[in-house]
Amino acid sequence: MLVARASSRWALPGGTIKRGETPLEAAHRELCEETGVTGQHLVYSMQFTGLAKIHHVFFAEVGPDQTPQANNEIEKCKWFPIDGVDALRASIPTKRIVELVYNHEIRKA
């Protein structure tokens, strides 16, 4: 699932970790704030270091009863096939993280 702010590129849901928050707590908060998805079991996947940011990447399994909806500053929220993300107008870290996940999942299959 990717999100986009008004007139912006697609990106993975996320944001800044607040003071006193763990990366896991921030991931839960950002997922809820940006997509309305709550109560998910998040699993830490990896840390990805971009040019100016450190990205803590989590996996979440979203059940059929949870339909993501764009919230707050997010204008669009959409599911994409993992192998189609590279063709999107998306941030470089988003494309790289998805590529790493895709390659890892393909090797496991």
Which positions does each model-derived feature cover?
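N-terminal strand-loop-strand
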Residues: M1-L12, G39
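The catalytic Nudix box helix
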Residues: L12-S45
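Active-site-adjacent beta-strand/loop module that shapes the phosphate/pyrophosphate-binding cleft
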Residues: M46-V85, P93-E105
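Conserved short hydrophobic patches within well-ordered secondary structure
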Residues: L2-A4, T35, I74
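Acidic/histidine-enriched, glycine/proline-rich intrinsically disordered or flexible terminal extensions
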Residues: R107-A109
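Residues at secondary-structure transition points
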Residues: K18-T22, I74, I92
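Short histidine/acidic/glycine/proline-rich micro-motifs that form metal-
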Residues: I17-K18, G84-D86
